[in-house]
């Protein structure tokens, strides 16, 4: 690829993402997030104008998220054959069996070359997040498994919507559809990648139950167990602390350091000492793969 055809960083590129992906150098991208059309058979308003005057009228028109085999899917599948024979074989099998040349098959054929190019441009440490909905997430997950050669899967995140879609009313024959899906893949799971663990604040009921003790200055804490589970079999040392001999989870040196800092306390004479764990030293609740408490971004939010 000539330098004149390569894309530069920190720019917003307009047009078909496949065209631009093909201009990005291999192993150069740290993070990929895509929120592609979901094959929802819905119509959406375009939020941008074409920089080319003669294209403006067509670009302003509503985007129709309905896929048909006649709309370039055959060419896309031929492109996949050149990029990855395994991925082509998978899609061809779906086409020949139950998906035929329907809308879902067309959707997958159009997604496949883009996902293959995304994997190519990702660094070994890069991660990909694909945002979709449950209507086709199972097909996309199978496609991603093939694109990443069966080794890149990390998580499937369920993201609860703030409101249910308007597909549920009295007399409905299905459960309300209230979630989206984030499929998370890493290019090389054997290579250390950047991952910043996320935490959410504790709710008030949890704080009241677990951190009901307070210092004179109002600093909340709880008294936590410091005995070593498994005893000697787990390598925990045994010695005396405040007149009590147990197997402890800390070395004697570490225990003495905590005592000097006032973090090891004895609730009453003869009781097993405990660790004074302050609420303000805790990061919060670990964010899992079930996102149900993320507020919507309104027009005044700083993320705008």
Where are these regions (language model features)?
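Class I S-adenosyl-L-methionine
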Residues: 2-24, 28-30, 38-142, 146-304
């Amino acid at each position: 690829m000539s330098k004149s055809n390569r894309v530069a960083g920190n720019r917003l590129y307009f047009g078909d993402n496949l065209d631009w992906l093909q201009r990005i150098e291999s192993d150069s991208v740290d993070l990929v997030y895509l929120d592609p059309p979901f094959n929802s058979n819905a119509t959406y308003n375009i939020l941008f104008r074409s920089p080319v005057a003669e294209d403006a009228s067509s670009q302003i028109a509503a985007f129709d998220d309905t896929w048909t085999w006649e709309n370039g899917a055959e060419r896309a599948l031929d492109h996949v054959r050149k990029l990855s024979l395994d991925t082509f074989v998978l899609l061809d099998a779906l086409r020949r069996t139950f998906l035929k040349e329907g809308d879902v098959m067309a959707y997958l054929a159009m997604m496949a070359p883009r996902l293959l190019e995304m994997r190519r441009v990702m660094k070994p440490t890069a991660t990909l997040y694909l945002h979709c909905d449950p209507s086709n997430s199972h097909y996309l997950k199978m496609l991603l498994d093939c694109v990443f050669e069966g080794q890149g899967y990390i998580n499937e995140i369920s993201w609860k919507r703030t409101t249910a879609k308007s597909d549920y009313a009295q007399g409905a024959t299905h459960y309300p559809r209230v979630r989206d899906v984030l499929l998370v893949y890493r290019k090389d799971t054997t290579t250390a990648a950047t991952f910043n663990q996320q935490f959410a604040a504790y709710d008030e009921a949890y704080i009241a139950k677990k951190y009901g003790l307070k210092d004179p200055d109002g600093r909340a804490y709880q008294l936590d167990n410091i005995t070593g589970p498994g005893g000697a079999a787990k390598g925990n040392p045994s010695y005396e602390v405040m007149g009590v001999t147990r197997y402890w989870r800390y070395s004697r040196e570490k225990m003495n350091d905590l005592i000097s800092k006032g973090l090891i306390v004895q609730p009453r004479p003869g009781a097993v000492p405990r660790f004074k764990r302050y609420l303000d030293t805790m990061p919060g609740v670990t964010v899992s793969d079930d996102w149900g408490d993320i507020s919507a971004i309104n027009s005044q939010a700083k993320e705008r």
